[in-house]
Amino acid sequence: MSADRPLIAIAIMAAISLAACGKPATDGETADSGGVQPAASPPLTDAQKAALQAELPEPYRSADLEKGEALYAMCRSCHTLVEGGASMTGPNLWGTFGAKAAYVTGFNYSDALKTSGLTWDFATMDKWIEKPRELVPGTKMSYVGMKSPEDRAALIAFLKVNTTPAK
C-alpha cells in the first residue's frame, strides 16, 4: 500500500496543475472566445430533425442523415455546428443556409470568398462541397471536394438539419 502513495500524490499534483492551466468558462462564455456568446439552443430531438428534413427539397429530403453525420466527421476538424460555437480553422456553420458567403463575424475569410457574392443555398452548397476551389478560385478552404452526388446530398441534409433552429 505504501508503494501506491507516491503514485496517488503524483496524480493529485498533476490534476491540480492541469486545473490551474486555464480560466474556466463561465455561463454564456467560452474559454477561447474572450467574451460572452449567445446561449445555445437545446439539441434537436430525432422527431424535430425528421420534421426539418421532411421540409427539404429532393434529394435532401430522402438523404441518409446518418451517412451525412459520418461524412461530417471530415469537416469536424475545422468546423463546428452548434449555435454560438467557436470558429476554428474554418468558421462555425450554424445558420449557414440562406446566409451570404463570409457571414461569420470575426472569421478571417479569403478575399475571394468575401467578394464572391454567394448565398449559401442548396445548389451553391452542393457546388462548394463538390469542388470549393473551382467555385471560388482563391479560397483558403483546403478541402479538395466530394465527387459523389449521393454523399453530397447526405452531408448537405445533415448540415441543414443540424444548423437550423427548431421551429
Language-model-detected regions and their locations in the chain:
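Sec-dependent bacterial lipoprotein signal peptides
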Residues: M1-A19
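Bacterial signal peptide processing site
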Residues: C21-A25
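Electrostatic cytochrome c docking/interface patches
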Residues: P38-L71
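N-terminal post-signal-peptidase region of extra-cytosolic proteins
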Residues: L56-R61, R76-T80, F107-K114
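Stable alpha-helical elements in mature extracytoplasmic
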Residues: D64, L71-M74, T89, D121-T124, ...
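Gly/Gly-Pro-rich "capping" loops immediately C-terminal to redox-active cysteine motifs
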Residues: L65-E69, E83-T119, Y143
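The canonical Cys-X-X-Cys-His
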Residues: G68, Y72-L81, L155-L159
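C-terminal capping alpha-helices of c-type cytochrome domains
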Residues: D121-K167
